[in-house]
Amino acid sequence: MRKYIPLVLFIFSWPVLCADIHGRVVRVLDGDTIEVMDSRKAVRIRLVNIDAPEKKQDYGRWSTDMMKSLVAGKTVTVTYFQRDRYGRMLGQVYAPDGMNVNQFMVRAGAAWVYEQYNTDPVLPVLQNEARQQKRGLWSDADPVPPWIWRHRK
């Protein structure tokens, strides 16, 4: 019974661990990083649970363009959980119509599930669907995940 106490505390503290930002996207850096104007300053957001191709990687520019078409200049809602080691907020991004942008990027084949850190059980299902239907980066016979591509560079 005692081993479940930390889990129960975590579950009940979840609402305290996350917060929302509402703001206009002022910059799209790549397929998984945006800047949102929050009150008076731009806040860098790293989309949680996904990893998009790097700009110089195959499909990198396409992934960035996909993100731009979804959110550039639009007001989004970001549910953020924490900051990463680079100071970026890790968050779930929702388009003005409520669409989950993180999930859309994976479904479109514009990003991988960041399996090492993923907490969204829907993402692997969406990635398998994109792979089977050869969407986006999955149209490549052997796409290289960004974490492997970065390691090689």
UniProtKB/Swiss-Prot annotation:
PROSITE patterns (UniProt xref): TNASE_1 (PS01123), TNASE_2 (PS01284), TNASE_3 (PS50830)
Top EC class of this enzyme: hydrolase
Signal peptide location: 1-19
Pfam families recorded: SNase
Tree of life domain: Bacteria
SMART domains documented for this protein: SNc
Alphabetized InterPro entries for the sequence: SNase_OB-fold_sf, Staphylococal_nuclease_OB-fold, Thermonucl_AS
GO molecular function: endonuclease activity; nucleic acid binding
EC number: 3.1.-.-
Record: active site: 46, 54, 88
UniProtKB keywords: Endonuclease, Hydrolase, Nuclease, Plasmid, Signal
Family: Belongs to the thermonuclease family.
Name of the protein in question: Uncharacterized endonuclease
Organism: Escherichia coli O157:H7
